[in-house]
Regions:
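Ser/Thr-rich low-complexity repeats and stalk/linker segments
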Residues: 2-12, 16-142
């Protein structure tokens, strides 16, 4: 590995660590969540959470994330995350639930184009984020 590659690698690592420490401007509104629970059968239901995400035009951070707090879950059912710009689907993801019922999905918001030497915003503006997870039924449905 030549000196230029080593310097680039070290600079990249330092950038990642610094972006993890500095709070970002990318936000998802948690006060305006819409939650719908639809029974699948007697034992499990599908919990759908709809929220919004805003990525400002002047964003400098490379990563965004969707994080779910520990809660009840059903084993072997992943969380499905869907991003929409208006009605247009933009990005879909599937992530496993951790043992405590939490989940985390990290995704690129900004990327470096090595051909042009410029940063490119992958996400910019307002998005609707739909999160689907399977939960155990707490009540019997008739």
């Amino acid at each position: 590995m030549d000196l230029k590659s080593k310097v680039f690698l070290i600079a990249s690592i330092m950038t990642v660590f610094s972006t993890m420490v500095i709070p970002g401007e990318t936000s998802a509104e948690t006060t305006q969540n819409t939650v719908t629970i639809t029974p699948i059968n007697d034992e499990i239901s599908l919990k759908k959470t709809v929220t919004t995400m805003n990525v400002p035009q002047d964003n400098k951070l490379p990563w965004g994330s969707v994080i779910g707090a520990p809660s009840e879950y059903v084993e072997r059912y992943p969380v499905i995350i869907q991003f929409y710009s208006g009605e247009d689907p933009v990005h879909f993801a599937q992530v496993d639930v951790k043992g405590d019922g939490s989940f985390e999905y990290k995704f690129r918001v900004r990327n470096f184009d090595s051909n042009t030497g410029e940063f490119v915003n992958i996400f910019e503006g307002d998005y609707t984020v739909k999160i689907f997870r399977v939960i155990p039924n707490t009540e019997k449905f008739v």
